[in-house]
Amino acid sequence: MVAAAKKRHTGGGKDMTLQYTALGDSLTVGVGAGLFEPGFVQRYKRKMEEDLNECVSLLVFAKSGLETSDILAMLNEPFIMEQVKKADVITITGCGNDLLQSLEIYEKEKDEHVFLEASSHCQKNYSGMLEKIGDIKGDKDTRYLVRLLNLYNPFPSIELADKWISGFNRHLKQLESAPQIKVIDTYAVFKGHEQEYLSIDRVHPNSRGYEAMAENLRAAGYGLLKS
């Protein structure tokens, strides 16, 4: 999906349109928001436009059911690489489907090592995504943002799921090695608000949940983009 924004120029001819490229799974798609309701991506785009007083061009590369390995693989596609290179802001959601698959296997085998394997797999793929983005951007381009949304727990009654998600989120936080990169604490946003923020499927956010996610992204600030 491509949402075009009209380009504005300063007197010196500098392009003042910001590009936002969103990568991910069903959360980036906006599943659960309701008919004609935007997910967090479109809401965050609007908040950026308000906060920065700039037009924002949006490109979304996402599909329900994608695992982190699929999202990493997308970064090898020439058109997506081009849009990542141009992007001022990049958001990534992932690992939710890896979690769901792990839960299904655990219910059959009762072996919690399946969660550790999934966590290690997700961490490796997220590291690969950031490395690939860095390669695409090159050393000279540092004026951009990458926002990684960590996992919330849609299954608060499953103690092992919460333990696994919390552990994964701690490891994800360690990827904030560069000033452009921030991990957004979606877990804290949903903790204790599952009834309020989850859709009828009890897995994906509803409209209020996506709004809370967008506000959390906004609260992370805009770094060098605001200078």
Predicted regions and their residues:
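Residue-level detector of flexible, active-site-proximal loop/helix-junction positions
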Residues: 27, 65-67, 153, 190
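Serine-esterase "nucleophile elbow" of acetyl-processing enzymes
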Residues: 2-64, 81
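Alpha-helical cap/lid subdomain in secreted, periplasmic
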Residues: 79-207, 211, 215-226
